[in-house]
């Protein structure tokens, strides 16, 4: 965020601020009144699980065959850089003689709390148009599926694993639940494509369960919703 702020200021952005969540927001005002466009990209990335399995240093930003390799190069620091640079260059080339306002935001926590940071950004600015720079293989995507996190829990009876017949294994119960959930076929939308219902993590308790039959199991599903769907 600090690096983006420094680059924005160097490129002549009129103002650059941090909000209470840590989002960085840069603004360039045109000389004539007009609409506001927001270019947004998140700055966070998913974790690197095993750096030794990478062909390049995940934090090295190495350039090979004209490509930058590193965690987040595509998702989505490359777009963040492109939007900052393009906005700064456009303002310089036009000498800010354009109608409206251009805002560029670097948002936080997209990978784990998608949607929270942009809501905070739009409390400060009220864009007429928004472009999210997520990688789309250079094709324009209009709109986005919604998102819900579905958590399912099963309960059993804990006991020592040397006498499993004295308990009820919550994980085995969860297996049956997951099999039934996988039979659900999400709806489709002509513009947004297929809805998604995907298992993303499963954990038992106690964990680690050294010699203990688990009494609880929790599974989390990533549900990408379509227009017209609700909690039901």
Where are these regions (language model features)?
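A structural signal for short hydrophobic beta-strand segments in well-ordered beta-sheet cores
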Residues: 16, 26, 61-63, 199-202
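Short gly/ser/thr-rich secondary-structure transition/capping motifs
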Residues: 18-19, 112-113, 133, 200-204
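Active-site metal-coordination/substrate-binding segment of hydrolases
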Residues: 34-103
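Beta-strand secondary-structure signal
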Residues: 25, 40, 99, 103, ...
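Residue-level marker for buried hydrophobic side chains located in beta-strands
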Residues: 37-39, 131, 157
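Metal-dependent amide/peptide-bond hydrolase catalytic core
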Residues: 1, 142, 151-232
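Acidic/histidine-rich catalytic neighborhood of metal-dependent amide-processing enzymes
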Residues: 76-145, 149
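N-terminal helical capping/dimerization or prosegment-like subdomains
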Residues: 1-49, 216-220
């Amino acid at each position: 965020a600090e690096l983006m702020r420094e680059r924005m200021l160097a490129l002549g952005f009129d103002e650059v601020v941090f909000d209470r969540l840590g989002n960085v927001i840069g603004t360039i005002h045109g000389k004539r009144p007009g609409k506001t466009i927001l270019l947004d990209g998140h700055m966070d990335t998913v974790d690197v699980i095993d750096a030794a399995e990478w062909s390049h240093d995940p934090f090295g930003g190495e350039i090979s065959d004209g490509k930058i390799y590193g965690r987040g190069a595509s998702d989505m620091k490359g777009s963040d850089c492109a939007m900052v640079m393009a906005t700064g260059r456009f303002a310089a080339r036009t000498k800010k003689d354009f109608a409206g306002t251009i805002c560029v935001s670097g948002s936080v926590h997209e990978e784990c709390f998608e949607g929270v940071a942009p809501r905070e950004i739009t409390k400060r600015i009220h864009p007429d148009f928004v472009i999210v720079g997520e990688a789309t293989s250079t094709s324009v995507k209009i709109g986005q599926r919604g998102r819900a996190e579905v958590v399912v829990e099963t309960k059993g009876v804990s006991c020592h694993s040397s006498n499993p017949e004295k308990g009820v294994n919550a994980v085995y119960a969860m297996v049956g639940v997951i099999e039934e959930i996988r039979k659900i076929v999400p709806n489709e939308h002509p513009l947004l494509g297929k809805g998604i219902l995907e298992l993303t993590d499963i954990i038992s308790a106690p964990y680690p369960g050294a010699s203990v039959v688990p009494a609880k199991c929790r599974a989390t599903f990533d549900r990408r919703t379509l227009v017209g769907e609700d909690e039901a």
